[in-house]
């Protein structure tokens, strides 16, 4: 077993204590962001989230048509996103519409802004 050593001469105990407290305070936020990023780590789900941000809400049939996938496949992805509290639903007659929750929209919007900026660069190149 390799012994791990640190080459620093002096530990800043105040800094270490402050960082530990900050992590403890932010633990719930870390868990929430980790959950969102884990779900968005799948390319199809990330695309669904992007489309929901752009269009505000879509039904599984619309997403299936846009992505060229079956409705059951889309529904499976939407179920995972809903179970993770990343999306919410609204029912109108027989149709269920999906949208991003407001908290998650705030978290994901900067990522989608980056995607839009990269897309614009490619279109103008």
Explain the meaning of each model-derived region.
Residues 58-61, 89, 117-118, 122:
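Functionally engaged cysteine thiol sites
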Residues 41, 74, 81:
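Divalent metal-coordination and catalytic microenvironments
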Residues 65, 76, 82-83:
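Alpha-helical residues within the helix-turn-helix
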């Amino acid at each position: 077993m390799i012994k791990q050593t640190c080459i620093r001469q002096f530990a800043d105990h105040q800094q270490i204590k402050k960082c530990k407290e900050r992590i403890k305070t932010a633990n719930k936020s870390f868990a929430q962001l980790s959950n969102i990023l884990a779900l968005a780590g799948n390319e199809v789900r990330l695309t669904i989230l992007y489309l929901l941000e752009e269009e505000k809400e879509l039904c599984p049939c619309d997403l299936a048509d846009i992505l060229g996938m079956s409705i059951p496949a889309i529904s499976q992805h939407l179920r995972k996103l809903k179970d993770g509290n990343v999306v919410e639903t609204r029912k109108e007659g027989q149709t269920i519409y999906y949208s991003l929750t407001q908290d998650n929209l705030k978290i994901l919007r900067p990522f989608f802004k980056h995607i839009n900026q990269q897309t614009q660069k490619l279109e103008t190149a």
